[in-house]
Amino acid sequence: MSEHLLSVEDLKTYFFTSRGVVHAVDGVDFYVDEDEAVGIVGESGCGKSMTAFSVIGLVPSPPGRIVGGKIFYLGNDLTKIPDDKMRKIRGKEIAMIFQDPMTYLNPVLRIKHQLGEAITLHQGKKNIDVAVQSALELVRIPSPRRVANGYPYELSGGMRQRVLIALALLLHPRLVIADEPTTALDVTVQAQILELLKQIRLEVKTSLVLISHDLGLIAEACDRVYVMYAGVMVEHAEVIDLYENPKHPYTTGLLKSALSIDEFKEDLSIIHGSVPNLMNPPSGCRFHPRCPECMPICIEKLPPRINLGSDDKPHEVSCWLFKG
């Protein structure tokens, strides 16, 4: 039985298409403790969002399905429970903030109706208006009663994102997964949403998994971070340790490619190439076609995960440059 709030072990989520099998998530391990913020960072197409969908049981099926691994929540394997029990956990115990509010908010239904559906599903119809207004107040929406009676198209992008956050927090879940919650917003609003998430997490004492390609966002909001590439985790450490002392060449490349006002005179570093086709992933280390440190063994064998830190302060890396 897991000692963590959430523990994902060797998770594999594949998509079976007419052209072949897509290894979207291919042996992922990570954990989240109570009252902790954990980041998952990587380029688009690395499997971050599909990892989140796997955890909350929303993998599009067909063509996708979880083909291996375990997802322990409070010691119970979510991959083995029936759909009706998973629906009771989703939203009430584990909630998700999606990245595009206009995709996940119905434009022709009032805000209070959309938030009220979640309450009705888990708690019945009692005190819906009070609960909706309280949730909107929690995310600092001005005039919450007016907003509750309005429609999504009447709100700005930042306000719509606040509504999605309110929807996720409506039933006071123990774990919230935020999937690129600031992607569609301008920089000023991004900062406001990030600060809001940090404040609310402390107020309601919930754990957070923050998925992003933005290294600055992860550094600002998280305690630990996992680096994901081509369906696998390649590095894991406390945020400060990873940013100050990256081990995997992919992590190093991500950090060097991030813009910094302190280094505006230098040429911007890039990672050459692109994320591989997960229908036919590279042999050995999946980063080897793009890696400046590539050795023959990197092409031949998948590197094991090695802890270069301690049990209390792990710094795990999967790279043949490190042999323990």
Where would I find each of the regions flagged by the language model?
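Short catalytic/signature loops enriched in Gly
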Residues: H4, P142-A148, H236-G324
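Conserved ABC ATPase signature
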Residues: G150-L155, M159
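Conserved ABC ATPase "signature" region
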Residues: D77, N127-R146, K198, L255-K256
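P-loop NTP-binding/switch modules centered on Walker-like glycine-rich loops
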Residues: E43, I177, P181, L185-E266
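Conserved ABC transporter NBD signature motif
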Residues: I66-D77
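A short, proline-enriched helix->beta-strand linker immediately N-terminal to the Walker B motif
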Residues: L170-R174
